Swiss-Prot record:
Alphabetized UniProt keyword annotations: Activator, DNA-binding, Nucleus, Transcription, Transcription regulation
Phylogenetic classification of the source organism: Eukaryota, Viridiplantae, Streptophyta, Embryophyta, Tracheophyta
Entry GO MF terms: DNA binding; DNA-binding transcription factor activity; protein heterodimerization activity
Compartments in which it is found: Nucleus
Organism, as annotated: Arabidopsis thaliana
Composition bias type Polar residues, residue spans: 1-10
The protein, known as: Nuclear transcription factor Y subunit C-7
GO cellular component terms listed in the entry, alphabetical order: nucleus
Top-level taxon in the UniProt lineage: Eukaryota
PANTHER family membership: HISTONE-LIKE TRANSCRIPTION FACTOR CCAAT-RELATED (PTHR10252), NUCLEAR TRANSCRIPTION FACTOR Y SUBUNIT GAMMA (PTHR10252:SF8)
Function comment: Stimulates the transcription of various genes by recognizing and binding to a CCAAT motif in promoters.
Location, primary (coarse class): nucleus
Region annotation (Disordered) ranges: 1-23, 190-212
Tissue: Expressed in flowers.
Amino acid sequence: MEENNGNNNHYLPQPSSSQLPPPPLYYQSMPLPSYSLPLPYSPQMRNYWIAQMGNATDVKHHAFPLTRIKKIMKSNPEVNMVTAEAPVLISKACEMLILDLTMRSWLHTVEGGRQTLKRSDTLTRSDISAATTRSFKFTFLGDVVPRDPSVVTDDPVLHPDGEVLPPGTVIGYPVFDCNGVYASPPQMQEWPAVPGDGEEAAGEIGGSSGGN
């Protein structure tokens, strides 16, 4: 009898769906960023990448000379051979990257009420800097693209998940702590490569294995 009573506890009546409280709407309490991009920003970028994925197999026309790309790849002493597909892939990737960055810069120009992008104008650097700052995937260009102080210090950075990073975070150096939270990057120190370290380590390993 005791066992039956214990088993009956697992079959308690469950509340119906009408009695359950509605789930909390978290998105209503989240503040919108003050520097939000224009409304057609996301659909336009999404349509662009959909079209690019559809034309990814079209490798007959190249925007960059393949011979120069191959020459740059061979300038690396660690590269011994370059396949025929590698320059084609890099050329297509560079073309897509430049078009994406140009579109983001132009959308920032439209947001500011301007309709021209001139190379000699100082606003060009501001537009490109804003495009690289507002997109998390372009943070690797932080050391290449001239940074606009107004964009870097005043505007926080959007995380891919929609979170806003602290204003003190330096663009181009994403740093995570043990909890996955962004933190201020430490001072980066470049250590010069010492020639012969790899050979000496290999010799020590070979000597120890030979002695055994």
